[in-house]
């Protein structure tokens, strides 16, 4: 393989692009191009007033753990990024009903002892855990999750008041789309890495917010250009042409660290049939994230307040499941000044501090097949594809994807040979395991 330094453009500065550009910079001449005026993608930190202080609060990427995020852990260690322990408790409310799968929350409300709804949820949890353990033997793994649950006569409270809200917490608000996921995929990531292990992953958050790692990694990439609106990427006789409003630029290789639909738009008429088929399989759902101080979105009983708090909706509802993150608990903030982030609020909360939209990939049998076909187009004519969409949409998925491309171009991460990359399923089963209180 040719190991001489190449002129490479990385388009997109989320964790995927940052990781790819950082690793590639060790052996190549790299230009990181970002349309926005800031770097980081979902790694976005804002300053919130708490008393007399401005405190950093994350609005996108918030938590990770050492066991299931090996690349992210190694990156943080390499960059000397400080992290701290966090809490991953979970609650659901539906109307006046509130449920949190912890002894304190259940026993703290005597109504749960005689509630048919609560007992239906607990029976469903117990039965579903057994189903997860035997996921490899289910007869129709391509059935949707909701069809599997309804066909298996699972209690409706378990579906609407527990499992789908749990999925919404795991997938950043996209619980209604989780209902359409292949049940085999869903059960697999719940089972992988031991859903029923007593020793659960210990979750952590970046001290000072995720911008700490973004700023540190950016300093190690020699050429970073923000505010560059790339409008097209096309194959050229001697490389790849990148078009911006300032004119064309030419590179030996181009790494597209963008959402799949954005990638397809950049290729435009130059996209081949295989690229249209693979990249065109992915759809994204918009999720609104509102940072605020309105405690009315939380459970009525303070004892039920958790790090992650979901509001259930019936499957198929036009309204996405709403999830509220209690940032004081997640990021160890001053308990005297509550700050919340609500995804997809049904009505606007009071005391809004910040309002932003994120997009998350939606997964189904078509995307599963598209992911398996990615090697068909990877690296052909100097164009490379990466992003969290190549896994299950999480930070480790994105970083692993970018580092995989860098390694293929002869510039692996320094820890490349010392870890076994986490599968997407392992990442999500760990998060689900913790939220479920297994």
Language model features with spans:
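Helical element adjacent to the flavin cofactor pocket in flavoenzyme catalytic cores
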Residues: 187-244, 249
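N-terminal Rossmann-like FAD-binding beta1-loop-alpha1 element of flavoenzymes
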Residues: 6-32
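Mobile amphipathic helical/loop "lid" adjacent to a hydrophobic cofactor/ligand pocket
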Residues: 66-180
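Extreme N-terminal leader/targeting segments of oxidoreductases
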Residues: 1-8, 27, 48, 370-372, ...
């Amino acid at each position: 393989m040719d190991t001489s330094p190449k002129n490479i453009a990385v388009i997109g500065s989320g964790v995927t692009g940052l990781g790819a550009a950082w690793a590639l910079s060790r052996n190549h001449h790299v230009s990181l191009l970002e349309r926005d005026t800031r770097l980081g993608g979902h790694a976005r930190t804002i300053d919130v007033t708490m008393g007399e202080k401005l405190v950093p609060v994350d609005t996108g990427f918030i938590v990770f753990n050492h066991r299931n995020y090996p690349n992210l852990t190694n990156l943080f260690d390499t960059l000397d990024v400080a992290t701290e322990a966090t809490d991953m408790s979970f609650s659901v409310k539906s109307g006046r009903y509130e449920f949190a799968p912890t002894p304190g929350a259940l026993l703290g409300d005597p109504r749960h002892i005689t509630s048919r709804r609560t007992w239906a949820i607990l029976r469903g949890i117990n039965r579903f855990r057994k189903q997860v353990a035997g996921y490899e033997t289910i007869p129709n793994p391509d059935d949707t999750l909701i069809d599997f649950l309804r066909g298996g006569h699972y209690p409706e409270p378990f579906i609407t008041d527990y499992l789908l809200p749990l999925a919404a917490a795991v997938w950043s608000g996209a619980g209604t789309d989780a209902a359409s996921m292949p049940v085999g995929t869903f059960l697999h990531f719940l089972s992988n890495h031991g859903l029923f292990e007593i020793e659960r992953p210990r979750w952590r958050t970046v001290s000072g917010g995720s911008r700490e790692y973004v700023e540190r990694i950016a300093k190690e990439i020699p050429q970073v250009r923000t505010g560059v609106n790339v409008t097209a990427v096309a194959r050229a006789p001697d490389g790849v042409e990148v078009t911006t409003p300032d004119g064309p630029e030419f590179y030996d290789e181009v790494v597209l660290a963008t959402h799949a639909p954005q990638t397809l738009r950049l290729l435009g008429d130059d996209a081949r049939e295989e690229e249209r088929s693979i990249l065109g399989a992915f759809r994204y759902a918009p999720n609104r994230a509102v940072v605020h101080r309105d405690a009315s979105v939380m459970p009525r009983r303070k004892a039920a307040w958790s790090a992650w708090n979901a509001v259930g909706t019936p499957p198929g509802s036009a309204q996405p499941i709403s999830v509220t993150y209690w940032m004081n608990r997640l990021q160890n903030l001053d308990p005297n000044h509550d700050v919340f982030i609500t995804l997809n609020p049904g009505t606007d909360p009071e005391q809004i501090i910040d309002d932003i939209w994120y997009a998350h990939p939606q997964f189904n049998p078509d995307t599963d097949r598209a992911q398996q076909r990615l090697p068909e187009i990877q690296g052909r004519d100097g164009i490379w594809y990466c992003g969290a969409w190549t896994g299950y949409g999480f930070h480790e998925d994105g970083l692993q994807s970018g580092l995989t491309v860098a390694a293929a171009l002869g510039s692996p991460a320094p820890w490349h040979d010392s870890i076994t990359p986490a599968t997407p399923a392992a990442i999500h089963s760990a998060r689900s395991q913790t939220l479920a209180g297994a």
